[in-house]
């Protein structure tokens, strides 16, 4: 069975060098929800962290029908801190919530804050507020979040370090400011009238515009109206579409994630209106907010690949890749590990079996992954990455384009950690080392000891891994909010289940306690993972996990049947098939047609025909 829960304490290690990386002195406040909250509680406790507390939103499922919710049961009452919600609905509420989190941390003696993969986790203002309050964020610093997390800044950095990027415009607001005033002197004068200044000596006109805009954000002043930027968006979109006949474009907010803040448009679409929609969706309409949006070529038939990065500010290391192309409504559903060792072994096996074409395709895939990993490491070092982040790319054939960096832990981080171990070795005595097999764990280590941690080696763990997101959805994979889980079978051998603690039994009776899904934030219920000696084995194991999972309840609808069918499609076709991000939609259409055809079949007649078949 994959080693997930185990003793991670370093305080009692025989080596003084290893002991120096002990984390038991940390005091951590967890400010997120979902499976990552329970995972973080477990990992930090396994690391020996003496004090772990959590926020609890009023929107969370606080009570079972007949018992306390698992998050509440596993935490001492004095370490549960109620809040109205985790982020606030407006900028003012967000500022209020951040101040509340800082106050809770100071009042209760927390030194570190962990935000999982919620919106707060890559909010530079939130991280900066923690830093100013003397708290340590378990994640990238505000400097890194700004440099890597803002999609426009990240794209400029990518170009500087020879990373492939999609064609388009990354400086919409700079262009709008110059178009409004027509000269550097005009921009400087207009900004000065609003109390904004910046050093623009020797800067070209768009660079000068960007410097003035950055100064305006710091001052909380708008140099442009939303209407002015929207008009510039329409101008840029029209120009790009004229140069790219027949193509579509993607408007993408510089912040956001999970598909939020993005719109695809074609010739004739109202780019200005779509721009306004995006700003509203990512809550960037306030005075002083950075309202820049990327305008990029939309690569239609794409795969979505990403690289797991870890860094300490000096070095950056890749833990391998993930294929996240199997998605719907911009939400990932099934994530697959893609690593150089696995692809190399798979290519050799196919060649030995006489399948030269697939062997060559797998070798090409391996080369592609190697390029993405190298680019990810260069990018991480360029921005001084000092925690965990994900380098995301779109893949078109054997080419890839940098898409964005998520400066946080991802939902699917376990897909990578199940395939790799980070081995930290004493540079003065190579025989002394310690291993880390958890992204959450290494984030804690980096927050406590980052500059001292030597660049780790990558040691093999499992050759392949898969993650299925078990969501509360209807048959179209649209969210099905609410519902109650009354029974859930125990995990089978080798199954890794991150279920928010839902399956924790009643400590007195050992019985399953019915759980009411809140449905206030997203539809995810749990993450189901498996590993294998190769991709085929990991798919076969996941198929067995799904087959044996018994999940019942009232008004409960999940995508477990979808996953069971999808996994068997790959097992019956080829586990190394490379679906695009459009695959799931087409798959659902074909499944619906098959279901309608099956309704017309007389099962008794079909069974008799099978018995008579030679």
Give the label of every model feature segment.
Residues 1-38, 42-46, 82, 92, ...:
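ATP-dependent carboxylate activation and anion-phosphoryl transfer catalytic cores
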Residues 1-165, 170-208, 222-225:
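ATP-binding N-terminal substructure of ATP-dependent carboxylate-amine bond-forming enzymes
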Residues 97-101, 233-240, 376:
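Generic hydrophobic alpha-helical segments
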Residues 94, 202-206, 226, 230, ...:
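Intrinsic-disorder-associated interaction segments
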Residues 86, 211, 411:
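Glycine-/small-residue-rich beta-strand-loop submotif within the FAD-binding core of flavoenzymes
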